[in-house]
Design a protein with these regions (language model features):
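Metal-ion/cofactor- or nucleotide/acyl-coenzyme-handling active-site neighborhoods
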Residues: 2-314
Length: 314
């Protein structure tokens, strides 16, 4: 255990030094971007996690009333949607074209997001993933900028993951805190969002657009980019052969031919541990024992019925 803590400490120090030396000089904010004070932004006990699944377009008016009344956290290309969340988290894609699109959309939406807290993970990987970040990433324009360290959760099988989650929880890895500097992470940003919801003290987390049942996105509808003159959103190839070629060009290791009809986080070609099982494990081993309720917005999510739905589709 002591060795593991030393490793975490060493990684964080390298992360902290990178942020202070390379990121902090570009910021105009007066706060420390390595320490997030939750109370500065949190105004509700419910957190709506806003992902990009196509079911976002099926949410009923009651859901939007609740989302506007409570806190929300937008993920990655949520920027295409008109709703401005309390929190926003993104990571820079390994695909240069996708990274460039994210930067373009981010810059256009920054005036709308003036009061939103940005939680940026893997910020120390900008040199690798987006070399031109030094001149093109609008860091200085982000008023509430925070760089959070990602703590990797171990486990390559469901059983191993559940053991790791129980162990991490016992060691205080998911402890609630008024000031956050790091968040546990497993594969996808939605896990980080749930970790954040728990550690920031939310009592209820609602997953919106976490469909996992198909490869559709809400921003596939042209109205989202046309309304604000945004660039076309990135898409994955629709054929297995083209998708395989795309992944290979990015250095992604595949166990077999990928399936373009399903969400990439549940594709066994990419990882034998699907994202839905990761979410269920986190719910069972961490959220429920900590007294945090987890819901999906709509029953069309692959997570339903093991995780209950709050609304019916319009």
């Amino acid at each position: 255990m002591l060795l593991a803590l030393k490793k975490i400490g060493g990684r964080y120090r390298r992360f902290r030094d990178t942020v202070r030396q390379r990121i902090l000089p570009k910021l105009r904010c007066t706060h420390d971007p390595l320490k997030l004070r939750v109370a500065d932004f949190k105004k509700s006990d419910t957190l709506y996690v806003l992902a990009s699944g196509g079911s976002i377009n099926d949410l009923p008016p009651q859901a939007w009333d609740d989302i506007r009344r409570c806190d929300s956290l937008g993920i990655n290309f949520w920027l295409y949607h008109e709703h401005v969340p309390t929190w926003f988290s993104c990571e820079v894609s390994r695909t240069p074209a996708d990274a460039a699109t994210l930067m373009q959309v981010l810059e256009k939406r920054l005036p709308d997001y003036a009061n939103t807290a940005f939680l940026l993970k893997d910020i120390h990987k900008l040199d690798e993933r987006y070399p031109q970040w030094n001149s093109e990433f609008p860091l200085s324009q982000i008023r509430h900028f925070y760089a959070l360290h990602s703590l990797s959760v171990k486990g390559r099988t469901v059983a191993a993951l559940r053991r790791a989650l129980r162990w991490d929880r016992a060691l205080g890895g998911f402890k609630k805190s008024e000031e956050l500097w790091a968040l546990p992470m497993k594969r996808a940003t939605v896990f980080l969002a749930m970790s954040f919801g728990l550690m920031a003290g939310y009592k209820r987390i609602v997953l919106c657009g976490v469909d996992l049942s198909n490869s559709a996105y809400f921003y596939d509808h042209p109205r989202y980019r046309e309304a604000r003159g945004l660039p076309e959103a990135p898409t994955l190839p629709s054929s297995a052969e083209a998708l395989e070629q795309r992944y290979a060009s990015e250095g992604v290791k595949m166990l077999k031919m990928p399936d373009p009809t399903i969400h990439n986080t549940i594709d066994p070609a990419l990882n034998p541990l699907p994202m839905d099982e990761i979410i269920h494990a986190f719910h069972d081993e961490v959220l429920r024992p900590e007294g945090v309720e987890l819901f999906v917005a709509l029953p069309s999510s692959r997570l339903f019925p093991r995780i209950p739905a709050l609304y019916a589709a319009v």
